Amino acid sequence: SLRHRWLDDFFIVLTQLGYRAPMTLWGVLVTLALLLQRNTYAATLWVGTLLLGQTLLVGLKQWIAWPRPNLVAMPPESWAFPSGHTTMGLVFLGTLTILCLPGVPGRRQKAILSAVCILATTIAAARLYLTVHWPTDILGGLLLGGMILACLHTLVLQRPFRTVRPWPLIAATLAAWVISLFTWVVPHYGDIVHRYLPLSLS
């Protein structure tokens, strides 16, 4: 089996941070960080892109209605295609990157882009590792997220935003992850692990 305890723990924690409550907290804290910089346009871009991503994601899931693989004790209840974690993980990270990069020195931009790509790929891989998605769901999520980011990039090229100070946004992101970890993951970890047990072990 490809399942190992330390990988289970890593991917389960990562995937739990991609559910609605943690992502909502992340979105709210970054919005506040942008508003505290009095950068209303950048805040509007942030919120608008996230809402567009969520709307398209839910619409496609309901329209395609593709069932998930039935390989774990308690598969998520939503439809499989496209992967919501993959889509919104890419949209959140990509939008944050588009907003932050102009305020980052050039020599650090490649490092940030590499880190974002690795994290987005790892989020997608977590859903495959936990066997709650088909590979096509992940591909669909990457394509949908990429299309949304391409639209945002085009808009920003036509109507640039005032440079954002990146560190408050990064701090807001880290705060959201830590709060979410100790609010929605750690206290319920035993039950969460049970959901992802392979059927042969549940």
Language-model regions, residue ranges each:
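Membrane-embedded catalytic cores of phosphoryl/pyrophosphoryl-handling enzymes
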Residues: 70-197
